Every structure is written in structure tokens, then in C-alpha cells.
């Protein structure tokens, strides 16, 4: 069988689709290798998932100052291409798959310079900068959306957003995470790297609406699978616990602010399969990967889109989830006034169950398999 290289990295939105597709290709007998930034998140994820990894240098193509490229980043990008060429010449893959983001660029450009076939996956509704650089010489582009701005009509193949299609029982997931099995579980995540804004705003909002005891007043034990031990006998409120993935660099800032709340669990990094399986409700940004994982696990969302996302794509992502009945959108500028009310609305049992069904209906089951099919179509015939 063939060796397929996954050029990926930077954020979970680029990395986890590569992991899901690599696993699918492995199951079909192919060998896979993740190629990304040396020392990046992708190196850690590959080790955790038992996948082979090679690291190279990588430079962000962001612009600084008066629209001039940062020469240091350009140098790193060029050096990364040189290093990636060495890796590909040594490993001789049949095909390289690019998942977008600056960390994928060295591998994709190196492959194209060596005449190795490339296939791309675009996770957003707008073709990213790295993909725009590479798309002209790519054999095919798999997409998560029917229409992708910047990609000529008919040049993309809708495959969906590959996610790790693994499910745990709620009880097993909560056991692994050290959570109680009774309370309503709220998962807070600002993407794979965390979100400074959510880290600053969510703890105070949840403290305000849940109080020191962590209770949703007025919902009672019907709000979730509540053990009597977690229902306050006087307030009659439903017990809540929070799992907040802050991102490693911000844990030290968030943890002291919630240390007095027994129901609030701040962690730097969490296994997202377990976290989604444990969650009854989540407060998140609106990256495509996050929304796809929530849909697969049937988790209702309160979404705070990143306003700086290109073409405001996170807002439009979130709006599509809300229109499908699977969540609520709270714009960042309105968080102080609206976030608490949105959480209370989505925690109401009838609303939450309806949103869960709507989320499951949005799930693009089998995306990794469909993308693997597309990749196999472009493997050289032996």
C-alpha cells in the first residue's frame, strides 16, 4: 500500500481532520505520516494518537506594519520548504495532503516542487491563504462546505469535516475526566489553543448565574441526570459542573479565579472526545472543527464567534448552527449582557433536548471516509 503524508499543524481545526483521515487510511492498509511544525501542537497530538511525525520549520504568512511581509517569517517558511523536501525525498510518499494553515505550507510546496501529487482539504467557507498558494497545482480539493469562496465552481468535492468518530458513554467520559456523574456538565473551550476572551469572561458570567454552590435556580433536578447529592435542598436548583479547557498558557491565570468554586474545573488541555461525550452543553468559539465535533456528539452550543476571523466566517458558521436549532449565537461585543441569558435558555431541559436532536441531525458522519476515498482516487496506480 501507499505512504500518504498529512501536511498539517498550527491549530486543532487543521490537525484533527488530518488525524481522523490518517486513521481512516491506516485502517485501509495505507501508511501515513504527519508533517508539521517542529515543536508545534501537531507533534504532541501525533504522539498521543500513535501516529508517525516529522517536524520542519514553518513561518506564518501574516503581514506586519504597512502590509509588508515579516522577513523573519518568510525566511522560516522558505527554510521549512527546504527541510520538507529532504523529508519527502527520504520517505518517497505517493501523495501529500494539505490541510491549510501556515504549518502545512512547507510540506505542500515541497511536494509540488518535487512533482509529488497533492490533495487539499479546506475546512472553511473561504479558501485560506495557504490553500490559495497551493490550489493551482493540486489534484483535488475536499471541502467542508458546498460553496467555498475563492474556489472556482466545480473544482471542490464536498466531503465534510473529518472528526474523530469515537463515542464514549457519558459515565465513562466523566470518570476519565474526574467529573461527577450527576450534575449538568458545561464544557467551555475556546479552540485548541484556548481563548483569552472566553477565559476572561466566562468564569465571571457562570459565577454570577450559578452562585457559589453551582446551582441553576428554578430548573430543579429535571435539568439533567442529577444525583440527590448535588441538588441543594433549600434552593431547589439543579447542580452544574463546568469543565473549562483554558489552553496551556492561560491555565495559571484562570485557575486562581475559580479555586473557591468546587464545581468549576479549569484544565490547560483536555481530551476532546471525552469532553464532548461528558458535556450536556458547551460554550465555544465557532471554528468549523469545533462545530463538527459538537454535532457528532449532539452537544448544544452557546457560541461566541471570533470577530477577527477572516471574512467574519466564524459568525456565519455560528449563525448556520443557530438557524438549524442547535445553538445560540452571542456576539463578543454583547457577551456581558447576553451570555448568561443564553446559557440559562439552552440549559432548560426541553430546549436542550431539542438542540441535541438538531445538533445530531447536522453531523457529517463519514467525512473522513469520504475524504479518504477522494485521496485514494488520486494515488498513483502501481
UniProtKB/Swiss-Prot annotation:
It is a peripheral membrane protein. It comes from the Bacteria. It catalyses: di-trans,octa-cis-undecaprenyl diphospho-N-acetyl-alpha-D-muramoyl-L-alanyl-D-glutamyl-meso-2,6-diaminopimeloyl-D-alanyl-D-alanine + UDP-N-acetyl-alpha-D-glucosamine = di-trans,octa-cis-undecaprenyl diphospho-[N-acetyl-alpha-D-glucosaminyl-(1->4)]-N-acetyl-alpha-D-muramoyl-L-alanyl-D-glutamyl-meso-2,6-diaminopimeloyl-D-alanyl-D-alanine + UDP + H(+). Keywords: Cell cycle, Cell division, Cell membrane, Cell shape, Cell wall biogenesis/degradation, Glycosyltransferase, Membrane, Peptidoglycan synthesis, Transferase. GO terms for biological process: carbohydrate metabolic process; cell division; cell wall organization; lipid glycosylation; peptidoglycan biosynthetic process; regulation of cell shape. Its EC number is 2.4.1.227. UDP-N-acetyl-alpha-D-glucosamine binds at residues 11-13, 124, 164, 192, 314. The keyword tRNA processing does not apply. The keyword ATP-binding does not apply. Disulfide bonds: none annotated. One of its GO terms (molecular function) is UDP-N-acetyl-D-glucosamine:N-acetylmuramoyl-L-alanyl-D-glutamyl-meso-2,6-diaminopimelyl-D-alanyl-D-alanine-diphosphoundecaprenol 4-beta-N-acetylglucosaminlytransferase activity. Belongs to the glycosyltransferase 28 family. MurG subfamily. The gene is murG. This is UDP-N-acetylglucosamine--N-acetylmuramyl-(pentapeptide) pyrophosphoryl-undecaprenol N-acetylglucosamine transferase. Pathway: Cell wall biogenesis; peptidoglycan biosynthesis. It is an enzyme of class 2 (transferase). Gene3D superfamilies: Glycogen Phosphorylase B. It is found in: Cell membrane. Cell wall formation. Catalyzes the transfer of a GlcNAc subunit on undecaprenyl-pyrophosphoryl-MurNAc-pentapeptide (lipid intermediate I) to form undecaprenyl-pyrophosphoryl-MurNAc-(pentapeptide)GlcNAc (lipid intermediate II). GO terms for cellular component: plasma membrane.
Amino acid at each position: 500500500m501507499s505512504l500518504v503524508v498529512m501536511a498539517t499543524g498550527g491549530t486543532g481545526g487543521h490537525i484533527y481532520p488530518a488525524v481522523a483521515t490518517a486513521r481512516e487510511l491506516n485502517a485501509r492498509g495505507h501508511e501515513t505520516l504527519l508533517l508539521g511544525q517542529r515543536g508545534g501542537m501537531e507533534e504532541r497530538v501525533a504522539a498521543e494518537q500513535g501516529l508517525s511525525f516529522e517536524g520542519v520549520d514553518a513561518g506564518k504568512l501574516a503581514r506586519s506594519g504597512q502590509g509588508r511581509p515579516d522577513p523573519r517569517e518568510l525566511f522560516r517558511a522558505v527554510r521549512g520548504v527546504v527541510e520538507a523536501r529532504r523529508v519527502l525525498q527520504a520517505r518517497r510518499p505517493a501523495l501529500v495532503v494539505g490541510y491549510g494553515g501556515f504549518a502545512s505550507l512547507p510540506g505542500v510546496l515541497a511536494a509540488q516542487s518535487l512533482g509529488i501529487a497533492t490533495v487539499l482539504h479546506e475546512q472553511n467557507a473561504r479558501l485560506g491563504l495557504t490553500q490559495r498558494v497551493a490550489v493551482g497545482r493540486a489534484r483535488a480539493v475536499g471541502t467542508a462546505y458546498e460553496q467555498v469562496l475563492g474556489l472556482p465552481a466545480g473544482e471542490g468535492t464536498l466531503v465534510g469535516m473529518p472528526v474523530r468518530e469515537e463515542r464514549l458513554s457519558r459515565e465513562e467520559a466523566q470518570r476519565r475526566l474526574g467529573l461527577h456523574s450527576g450534575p449538568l456538565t458545561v464544557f467551555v473551550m475556546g479552540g485548541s489553543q484556548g481563548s483569552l476572551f472566553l477565559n476572561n469572561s466566562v468564569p465571571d458570567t457562570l459565577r454570577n448565574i450559578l452562585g457559589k454552590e453551582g446551582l441553576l435556580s428554578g430548573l430543579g433536578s429535571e435539568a439533567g441526570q442529577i444525583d440527590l447529592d448535588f441538588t441543594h435542598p433549600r434552593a431547589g436548583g439543579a447542580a452544574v459542573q463546568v469543565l473549562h479547557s483554558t489552553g496551556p498558557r492561560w491555565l495559571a491565570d484562570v485557575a486562581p479565579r475559580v479555586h473557591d468554586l468546587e464545581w468549576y474545573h479549569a484544565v490547560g488541555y483536555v481530551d476532546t472526545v471525552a469532553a464532548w461525550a461528558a458535556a450536556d452543553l458547551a460554550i465555544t468559539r465557532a471554528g468549523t472543527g469545533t462545530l463538527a465535533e459538537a454535532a457528532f456528539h449532539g452537544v448544544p452550543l452557546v457560541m461566541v464567534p471570533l470577530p477577527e476571523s477572516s471574512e467574519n466566517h466564524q459568525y456565519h458558521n455560528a449563525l448556520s448552527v443557530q438557524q438549524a436549532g442547535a445553538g445560540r449565537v452571542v456576539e463578543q461585543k454583547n457577551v456581558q449582557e447576553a451570555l448568561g441569558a443564553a446559557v440559562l435558555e439552552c440549559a432548560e431541559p426541553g430546549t436542550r433536548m431539542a438542540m441535541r436532536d438538531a445538533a445530531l441531525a447536522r453531523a457529517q458522519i463519514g467525512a473522513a471516509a469520504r475524504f479518504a476515498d477522494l485521496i485514494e482516487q488520486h494515488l498513483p496506480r502501481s
